[in-house]
Amino acid sequence: MFRQVYNLLEYLKFFLYGLIQGFTEFIPVSSTAHLKVISLFLGIDDPGASLSATIQLGSVLAIAWYFKNDIFNFRSQSSKKLIAYLLHKRLLRSILIGTIPIVLLGGSIKLFVPYFFDNVLRSNLSIALVSFLMAFFMYLADSSRRGSINIKNHNYSNSFLIGFFQAFAIFPGVSRSGITISSALISGWERGDAAKFSFLLGIPAISLAAIVEFISSFNDFFALGFFPLFVGLITTFVSSLLAIDFLLKYFSSNGLKIFIIYRVIFGIVILLNL
């Protein structure tokens, strides 16, 4: 009986981590910070690299599924569909170009400073301060004039600039979606397309992070077992779909104000519990 209760608690833990990852990966509040802080507050173990890789995969699958027509829409190059085809190819190139900065920065840190994130940058104090900084950056973005850049008319320099800011998401507490959406708004993107491009840009970025986690914890996958990881994967996939759909609809008529307030409150709560 005790064994059954223990297994149930393990499944609930994986379910909880999946929910947190799915919702906070796309809502601009930082999934890494929430996974770390909530695990500390609830007194449960850090999710670990193997579970992190699995739930990140769930987020990637959710993006790919939600935007499958944008990603996999390789139609024939008939004259009627030529413009759509060319726009599709340019979007894929833009995503690759926007991924370059985070690959360079993340790869350099992994190679030359492998224990970079095992220090003060992962502390609760650091996460709280980063949350305040992100709230200010998001405030600047929300206060900027509405732009006219979108998925169809953007250029490669636009995507590289957003990718440059995305690279800072390797620091715990930043929020990949938060910094990419905010930088897009500041540089003149329309709200809805800023969020959409941010999510699409997350496919290679989150995938690379999952691959790194997978390689570093390959043996742990067998120790955790298939079914607990599957629970985390499915939970993340479903909650990610809900988060993406919510945010795209929310951004059609709203700004970042509610998330700015949340990030300030989140930072204060962390400081009060140091």
Curated annotation (Swiss-Prot):
Q: Enzyme group, top EC level? A: hydrolase
- Check the record and name the InterPro entries matching this protein: UppP
Molecular-function GO terms, alphabetical: undecaprenyl-diphosphatase activity
**Membrane topology designation:** Multi-pass membrane protein
What EC number(s) would the UniProt record show? 3.6.1.27
Transmembrane annotation, as ranges: 9-29, 47-67, 95-115, 120-140, 161-181, 197-217, 224-244, 254-274
User: Please, one GO biological process term?
Assistant: peptidoglycan biosynthetic process
- Kindly list the places in or outside the cell where this protein is found, as annotated in its UniProt entry: Cell inner membrane
Q: Name one Pfam family in it.
A: BacA
Assigned keywords, A-Z: Antibiotic resistance, Cell inner membrane, Cell membrane, Cell shape, Cell wall biogenesis/degradation, Hydrolase, Membrane, Peptidoglycan synthesis, Transmembrane, Transmembrane helix
Domain of life of the native organism: Bacteria
Further comment found in the protein's record: Bacitracin is thought to be involved in the inhibition of peptidoglycan synthesis by sequestering undecaprenyl diphosphate, thereby reducing the pool of lipid carrier available.
Q: Which family does it belong to?
A: Belongs to the UppP family.
For this entry, the protein name equals Undecaprenyl-diphosphatase
- Gene source species: Prochlorococcus marinus (strain AS9601)
